[in-house]
């Protein structure tokens, strides 16, 4: 259920991880949604001004990211599936939840689906966990690491008052957006988004994803028991909701301090010069 997310922006390319959640629509088509970290696709975001009723309105748009799934047979890689996806919801890493919900544009891309841990009980500290992600942009391939649940939501409330959990699973460039799972039943308990050193990585817990989904009325993107809306309803959903300027100003100081403590977003990216040079095709991968 793990995939690579490839984001090709104007001045940079990036790669991270994601997880597929599959539903059937009213016509019986397999619809593949992908959860990833907001900062994995933030280079695809752009704004434009439009006139609505004589007033200026800022319209937020996203270029399609690419979803890459490796196909394996008898322990060998035999090919890759690549498909464009549209961005349905986005919450940025600085002022929001650092979450993004994508939808693969083609029906029946894959049949696999993640199962979210939606129980009210939070797994105990010391619980064995697994992380699956795309190491250094493996382009669809997955690497697995293990660790434990090392702390519940007291960590990093300083970043926009958001709750993170902590884990010792090994993370790497490309881990951002990848799932963290219970080792005993493989249920998804959170999304890896930040790191501050070896064995000290931060997870957006699934309970916070649930809070986000309830607020934006998209619990159908987590819970298969909830009916999916029709296409017209989905197409009218706003991609993002931004905090007020006042709130952003109040949070600036706390965010600056938190960045010093937890500096690493676990995304792989290629950065291009501000003035493109045809003789330079790619620059080396760097951590963002």
Where are these regions (language model features)?
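Extracytoplasmic
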Residues: 13-16, 29-35, 55, 63, ...
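Short, conserved beta-turn/loop elements at beta-strand boundaries and strand-helix junctions
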Residues: 23-25, 92-95, 152-158
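Catalytic-histidine neighborhood of serine endopeptidases
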Residues: 23-92, 207
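Glycine-biased strand-turn-strand hairpin within the trypsin-fold
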Residues: 1-35, 40-55, 226-243, 264-276, ...
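Short, surface-exposed secondary-structure boundary micro-motifs
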Residues: 37-39, 134, 194
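C-terminal subregion of chymotrypsin/trypsin-like serine protease catalytic domains
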Residues: 181-285
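Active-site region of chymotrypsin-like
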Residues: 1-7, 14-16, 105-115, 141-222, ...
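Active-site substrate-binding loop(s) of clan PA
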Residues: 19, 24-25, 44-57, 86-92, ...
């Amino acid at each position: 259920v793990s995939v690579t997310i490839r984001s090709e922006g104007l001045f940079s390319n990036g790669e991270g991880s994601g997880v597929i959640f599959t539903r059937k629509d009213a016509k019986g088509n397999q619809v593949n949604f992908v959860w990833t970290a907001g900062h994995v696709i933030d280079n695809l975001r752009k704004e434009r001004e439009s006139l609505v009723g004589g007033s200026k309105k800022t319209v937020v748009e996203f270029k399609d990211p690419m979803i890459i799934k490796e196909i394996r047979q008898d322990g060998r890689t035999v090919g890759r599936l690549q498909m464009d996806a549209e961005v349905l919801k986005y919450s940025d890493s600085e002022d929001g939840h650092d979450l993004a919900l994508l939808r693969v544009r083609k029906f029946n891309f894959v049949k696999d689906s993640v199962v979210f841990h939606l129980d009210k009980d939070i797994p105990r500290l010391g619980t064995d966990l697994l992380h699956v992600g795309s190491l250094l942009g493996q382009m669809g391939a997955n690497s697995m690491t293990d660790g434990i649940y090392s702390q519940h939501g007291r960590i990093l409330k300083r970043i926009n008052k958001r709750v993170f959990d902590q884990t010792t699973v090994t993370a790497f460039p490309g881990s951002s957006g990848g799932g963290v799972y219970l080792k005993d039943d493989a249920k998804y308990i959170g999304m890896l988004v930040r790191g501050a050193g070896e064995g000290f990585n931060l997870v957006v817990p699934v309970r916070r994803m649930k809070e986000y989904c309830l607020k934006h009325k998209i619990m159908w993107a987590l819970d298969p028991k909830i009916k999916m809306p029709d296409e017209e309803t989905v197409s009218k959903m706003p991609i993002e909701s931004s905090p007020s300027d006042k709130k952003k100003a109040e949070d600036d100081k706390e965010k600056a301090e938190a960045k010093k403590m937890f500096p690493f977003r676990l995304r792989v990216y290629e950065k291009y010069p501000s003035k493109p040079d045809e003789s330079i095709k790619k620059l080396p991968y760097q951590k963002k």
